[in-house]
Amino acid sequence: LRGVYLADQKNHIDHHTIIEHEDEHCTSNELYKGILSGKSTAVFNGRIHVHKAAQKTDAIQSNQNLLLSDDAIIHTKPELEIYADDVKCTHGATIGRLDEKGIFYLRARGIKKEEAQKMMMRAYIGEVLNGMKNSKAKETLLEKIIENIPEGE
């Protein structure tokens, strides 16, 4: 399960997901990434529910966010609800800003600041699309996302 969300101005975005593992040897990999700017707000509330019969389940849940302004807000709550005792499950959330050292590195090589930021955001979002087998569709989708990335401060 993969997702990308972009919010700017005063947009509000809510994501609520539930993944149910009910039988043995289940697997899931949930990755949601967001880019927020302006006074936008986003909510990620994801739950992985591993039932007692779902032994040997392998589940990963991650919510990662870039804040491009001081006024953008993210509320993130990844959850694991596990009733089996032989599982491998992880969850986590990150909230951060663009890597200033990375931007400096690119600018030192003659790339304009805005282009350096877009390159870094493209790489950031690209991870979400990595599982797509159709490379043309993947590139088209990535370009559409890049066109709609909100402007930072």
Annotate each predicted stretch with a short phrase.
Residues 1-104, 108-111, 125, 132-153:
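Conserved beta-strand/loop scaffold segments within soluble protein domains that form the structured core
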Residues 122:
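Short, conserved phosphate-binding/catalytic loop or strand-edge motifs used
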